């Protein structure tokens, strides 16, 4: 019996049927594997980001950084996570228990949901939605509601001020983000993440939206940093002004959820910058025809595995470049005031993103 399908999942299921397994049971197992692998990948990526930030920050400040927990301190993030799990979970006596407890979950769940539409290859995406990029913007706008609930439920003036700042900051920078995504969608004729990457691959390296939309890239880059609440945009948790902002009353696992959500959001934003502006999983470097050797081949299994691996590595390499820039900006730029942050969003980024959208639409109409 010869099995030859274009779908790797079908090939494995059919092989299991030949070996005597029940096809339905193996299908359920395969679904669980599909869910488990992305979760493990995200957790490993989270640990790597925390370690990289500590090492890069230490290098900028001429320190050694973590070095005792594992080789080169690679297990330091894991040790910190275990410490948070073992800490006591303290709840304010005069706070709102329901809002205080559900706030961290509302922050984490939408950020995790955005990973559903992130492609690491032509066939490596959990949900290839036709509105993938807008799905990311929609779910990311839910997170500030959790921050506002956490700040209000803490019954603390610093926490409440941090929650209000998070809501104001999100509203200010979600609109420029959406306008930049609309410009990309006009160029690609699609809102799907896979289609946007495929549209960039038609013209190679110079087809990246980074070159076709330089103004939009700058606006998207700044808005992404503000959405992640990274310095110089970490006003909701400014230590010198608000102690720790909406995190002031939190400890233990609930504080750990905010910590995880911050880095997950940074990783998701880096991956979306890669998908929208840097060609996604395509190598696309002139004079290096790497794509010819790693095509999606349904017959040659080795070539298929290498192609998948190369796509994942290329996507992560581009994303970690954005991460490096974000971490470096944390230690090189001073924090803005809240009025300066809102002015930047409403008076600078919004007009630029809107003008970029109008220019893109005009050029697309001329090309019809």
From Swiss-Prot:
Catalysed transformations (reactions): a plastoquinone + NADH + (n+1) H(+)(in) = a plastoquinol + NAD(+) + n H(+)(out); a plastoquinone + NADPH + (n+1) H(+)(in) = a plastoquinol + NADP(+) + n H(+)(out)
InterPro entries to which the protein is assigned, alphabetical: NADH_UbQ_OxRdtase_su1/FPO, NADH_UbQ_OxRdtase_su1_CS
UniProt KW keywords: Chloroplast, Membrane, NAD, NADP, Plastid, Plastoquinone, Quinone, Thylakoid, Translocase, Transmembrane, Transmembrane helix
Gene Ontology BP annotations: aerobic respiration; photosynthesis, light reaction
Record-level GO cellular component terms: chloroplast thylakoid membrane
EC supergroup of this enzyme: translocase
Presence of the UniProt keyword Transmembrane helix in the record: yes
Localisation per UniProt entry: Plastid, Chloroplast thylakoid membrane
Membrane topology: Multi-pass membrane protein
Disulfide bonds: none
Gene Ontology molecular function: any one: oxidoreductase activity, acting on NAD(P)H, quinone or similar compound as acceptor
Pfam families: NADHdh
Its EC number(s): 7.1.1.-
Sequence intervals crossing the membrane: 11-31, 33-53, 98-118, 131-151, 177-197, 205-225, 255-275, 305-325, 348-368
Assembly behavior: NDH is composed of at least 16 different subunits, 5 of which are encoded in the nucleus.
The family this protein is said to belong to: Belongs to the complex I subunit 1 family.
Function, in words: NDH shuttles electrons from NAD(P)H:plastoquinone, via FMN and iron-sulfur (Fe-S) centers, to quinones in the photosynthetic chain and possibly in a chloroplast respiratory chain. The immediate electron acceptor for the enzyme in this species is believed to be plastoquinone. Couples the redox reaction to proton translocation, and thus conserves the redox energy in a proton gradient.
NCBIfam families xrefs: PRK06076.1-2
Protein name as catalogued: NAD(P)H-quinone oxidoreductase subunit 1, chloroplastic
Organism, as annotated: Cycas taitungensis
Encoding gene (name): ndhA
């Amino acid at each position: 019996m010869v099995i030859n399908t274009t779908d790797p999942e079908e090939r494995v299921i059919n092989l299991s049927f030949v070996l005597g397994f029940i096809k339905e049971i193996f299908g359920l197992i395969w679904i669980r594997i599909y869910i488990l692998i992305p979760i493990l990948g995200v957790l490993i990526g989270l640990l790597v980001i925390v370690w990289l930030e500590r090492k890069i920050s230490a290098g900028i400040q001429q320190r050694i950084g973590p070095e005792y927990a594992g080789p080169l301190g690679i297990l330091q993030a894991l040790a910190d996570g275990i410490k948070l799990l073992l800490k006591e979970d303290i709840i304010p006596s005069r706070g709102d228990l329901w809002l205080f407890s559900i706030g961290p979950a509302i922050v984490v769940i939408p950020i995790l949901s955005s990973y559903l539409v992130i492609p690491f290859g032509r066939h490596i995406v959990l949900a290839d939605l036709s509105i993938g990029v807008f799905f990311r913007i929609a779910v990311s706008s839910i997170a500030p509601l959790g921050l506002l609930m956490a700040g209000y439920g803490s019954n603390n003036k610093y926490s409440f001020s941090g929650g209000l700042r998070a809501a104001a900051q999100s509203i200010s920078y979600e609109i420029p983000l959406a306008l930049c995504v609309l410009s990309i969608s006009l160029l690609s004729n699609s809102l799907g993440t896979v289609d946007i990457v495929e549209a960039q691959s038609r013209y190679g390296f110079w087809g990246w939206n980074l070159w076709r939309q330089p103004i939009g890239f700058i606006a998207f880059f700044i808005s992404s940093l503000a959405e992640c609440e990274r310095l110089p945009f970490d006003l909701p948790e400014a230590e010198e002004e608000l102690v720790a902002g909406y995190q002031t009353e939190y400890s233990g696992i609930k504080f750990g959820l905010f910590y995880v959500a911050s880095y997950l959001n940074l990783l998701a934003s880096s991956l979306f910058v890669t998908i929208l502006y840097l060609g996604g999983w395509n190598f696309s470097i002139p004079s290096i025809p790497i794509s010819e050797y790693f095509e999606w081949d349904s017959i040659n299994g080795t070539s298929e595995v290498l192609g998948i691996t190369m796509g994942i590595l290329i996507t992560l390499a581009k994303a970690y470049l954005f991460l490096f820039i974000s971490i470096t900006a944390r230690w090189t730029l001073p924090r803005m005031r809240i009025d300066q942050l809102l002015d930047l969003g409403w008076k600078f980024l919004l007009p630029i993103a809107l003008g970029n959208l109008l220019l893109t639409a005009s050029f697309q109409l001329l090309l019809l």
